[in-house]
């Protein structure tokens, strides 16, 4: 039995549902309980509203608004809807001014937004295929935004993994505050956050196992190249109706190699720590502003996501940094002294020390879901409890890494082993490390170069040259034109991965 069997089971069940985004029909009486459960699974109009401690409410069905028009006046209601539709269309046109790229992509509706970007659904005119376009506005306005944008571009452009969202195209336009960058990716029907809270019942165990397995496989691919995502959460895990999960939103991704420390001060300032990882999924080293961040921050987030799927609630639903720290101390007790000694902020250190040593809570109680009744996933299961404990270690060095997680008895039991997967090209790590040593102007020049250089197919001479990006002086020239597409060359990527994996170094974090 292979891991693909889990996906086949999900696909066969999800095939009974309607379009998870546009379907708003009420459940039919003759529908089987399993089909009804799956229909609610992708229902974008959950009845339970916003979950306790959740910072993101499930989105409403497309076209539905918060405006409630009372009375029997359908004409007025239709008039309101026409006005609202017009405002939405104008906002979409304002947000996604694609200029020359409008000949290739036609935006149809806004579907999401985050701290540093907005996303719309669009149609590729040549193939009539639906895609998602992420806009990073003012990408060149500050060194931090420019560096983040370059990181995301450089992570995604050579990635080729079924559990990581693929980059189909990229282009840029001139915005009011510099360069606006647009990333074109496959459109996914939903995300894990909506799946968890889109139904009154908690997820069944085989769904949890399948989603957890795909998440770990995607992280194995990234962590092999020392790439830390740093913003894992259910809303950044996209899910198709066939059950395929893909990791998305690499705006916070960073090379976690210990040799890259030049911009530690920038990455660890108060402003940055408010945006690296959403609060309920933020690892202790981020909360405590410790000197180093490694791929271990992703493993902490895996524990939070796993727990959220089990209990249908956030494990640590903090509302502020201080509240999150207190909640963490209540659950896990006081950190080891060696961790406290590494805390830079005096106020944070005092808060930890003043909290005192209290007995940490039992995982049987933390991961208990009343709605599951006697069918608990964690309670009484020694392997599961041990797996969770190893994910929630204060000390990042003692926290379980991705390789050991895949070999853990719990994972081995619930997720059948797969054949060794293709390794992440070492070029991804190399390109990410180059970004860290550039000033603002060099970042802008490299951003233009990265987008424009992708107009032409990548040759082997460029791949194996000492500096494929060119010198800074070369990058600052020939910058006319606003639209620069990237073509996907899947066979070339496979050949490159095969060539590079022969001499690829290992990274133990």
UniProtKB/Swiss-Prot annotation:
Cofactor(s) needed: Mg(2+)
Keywords carried by this UniProt record: ATP-binding, Kinase, Nucleotide-binding, Serine/threonine-protein kinase, Transferase
Domain (Protein kinase): residue spans on this chain: 105-411
EC number: 2.7.11.24
Residue sites binding ATP per the record: 111-119, 134
Enzyme superclass (EC): transferase
Family recorded in the similarity comment: Belongs to the protein kinase superfamily. CMGC Ser/Thr protein kinase family. MAP kinase subfamily.
First and last residue of the signal peptide: none
Positions of the catalytic residues: 231
Function per UniProt: Serine/threonine-protein kinase involved in the postembryonic regulation of body size, mainly through control of cell growth. In particular, controls the volume of intestine, muscles and hypodermis. In addition, regulates growth, intestinal granule distribution, lifespan and number of offspring.
Reaction equations catalysed: L-seryl-[protein] + ATP = O-phospho-L-seryl-[protein] + ADP + H(+); L-threonyl-[protein] + ATP = O-phospho-L-threonyl-[protein] + ADP + H(+)
Lineage, opening ranks: Eukaryota, Metazoa, Ecdysozoa, Nematoda, Chromadorea
Region Disordered, residue ranges: 19-72, 460-482
Compositionally biased spans, kind Low complexity: 466-481
UniProt protein name: Mitogen-activated protein kinase sma-5
One annotated Gene Ontology cellular component of this protein: nucleus
Amino acid composition bias (Polar residues), ranges on this chain: 20-30, 40-54
Gene name linked to the record: sma-5
Tissue-wise expression: Expressed in intestine with a stronger expression in the four most anterior cells, muscles, excretory cell, pharynx and, to a lesser extent, in hypodermis.
InterPro entries to which the protein is assigned, alphabetical: Kinase-like_dom_sf, MAP_kinase, Prot_kinase_dom, Protein_kinase_ATP_BS, Ser/Thr_kinase_AS
Transmembrane segments: none
Keyword Transferase: yes
Source taxon at top rank: Eukaryota
GO molecular function: ATP binding; MAP kinase activity; protein serine kinase activity; protein serine/threonine kinase activity
Record organism: Caenorhabditis elegans
Gene null: resulting phenotype: RNAi-mediated knockdown results in an approximately 50 percent reduction in number of offspring.
């Amino acid at each position: 039995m292979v891991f693909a069997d889990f996906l086949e089971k999900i696909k066969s069940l999800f095939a009974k549902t309607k379009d998870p985004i546009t379907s708003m029909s009420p459940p039919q009486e003759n529908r089987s309980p399993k089909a009804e459960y799956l229909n609610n699974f992708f229902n974008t109009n959950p009845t339970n509203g916003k979950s306790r401690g959740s910072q993101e409410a499930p989105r409403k069905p497309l076209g539905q608004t918060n405006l409630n028009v009372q009375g029997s006046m359908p004409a007025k209601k239709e008039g309101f809807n026409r006005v609202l539709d017009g405002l939405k269309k104008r906002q979409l046109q304002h947000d996604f001014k694609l200029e020359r790229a409008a000949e290739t992509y036609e935006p149809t509706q806004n579907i999401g937004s985050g701290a540093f970007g907005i996303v719309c659904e669009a149609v590729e005119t040549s193939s009539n295929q639906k895609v998602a376009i992420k806009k990073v506005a003012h990408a060149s306005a500050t060194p931090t935004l420019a560096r983040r944008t370059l990181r995301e571009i450089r992570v995604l452009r050579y990635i080729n993994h079924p559990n990581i969202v693929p980059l189909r195209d990229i282009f840029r336009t001139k915005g009011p505050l510099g360069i606006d960058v647009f990333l074109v990716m496959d459109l996914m029907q939903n995300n894990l956050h909506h799946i968890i809270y889109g139904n009154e019942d908690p997820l069944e165990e085989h769904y949890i196992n399948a989603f957890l397995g795909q998440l770990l496989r995607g992280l194995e691919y990234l962590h092999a190249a020392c790439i830390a995502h740093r913003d894992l959460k259910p809303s950044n895990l996209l899910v198709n109706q066939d059950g395929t999960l893909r990791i998305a939103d690499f705006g916070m991704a960073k090379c976690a190699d210990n040799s890259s420390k030049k911009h530690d001060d920038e990455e660890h300032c108060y402003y940055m720590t408010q945006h690296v990882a959403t609060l309920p999924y933020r690892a202790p080293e981020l909360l405590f502003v410790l000197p180093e961040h490694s791929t271990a921050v992703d493993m902490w987030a895996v524990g939070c996501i796993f727990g959220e799927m089990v209990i249908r609630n956030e494990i640590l639903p903090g509302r502020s940094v201080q509240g999150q720290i207190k909640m963490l101390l209540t659950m896990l007790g006081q950190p080891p002294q060696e961790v406290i000694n590494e805390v830079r902020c005096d106020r944070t250190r005092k808060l930890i020390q003043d909290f005192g040593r209290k007995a940490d809570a039992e995982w049987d109680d933390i991961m208990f879901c009343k709605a599951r009744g006697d069918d608990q996933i964690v309670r009484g299961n020694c392997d599961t409890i041990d797996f969770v404990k190893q994910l929630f270690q204060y000390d990042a060095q003692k926290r379980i890494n991705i390789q050991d997680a895949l070999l853990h008895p719990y994972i081995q039991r619930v997720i059948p082993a797969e054949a060794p997967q293709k390794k992440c090209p070492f070029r991804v790590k190399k390109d990410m490390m180059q970004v860290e040593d550039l000033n603002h102007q060099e970042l802008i020049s490299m951003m233009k170069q990265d987008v424009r250089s992708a107009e032409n197919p990548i040759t082997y001479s460029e791949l194996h040259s000492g500096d494929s990006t060119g010198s800074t002086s070369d990058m600052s020239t020939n910058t006319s034109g606003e639209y620069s597409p990237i073509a996907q060359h899947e066979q070339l990527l496979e050949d490159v991965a095969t060539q590079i994996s022969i001499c690829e170094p290992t990274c133990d974090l």
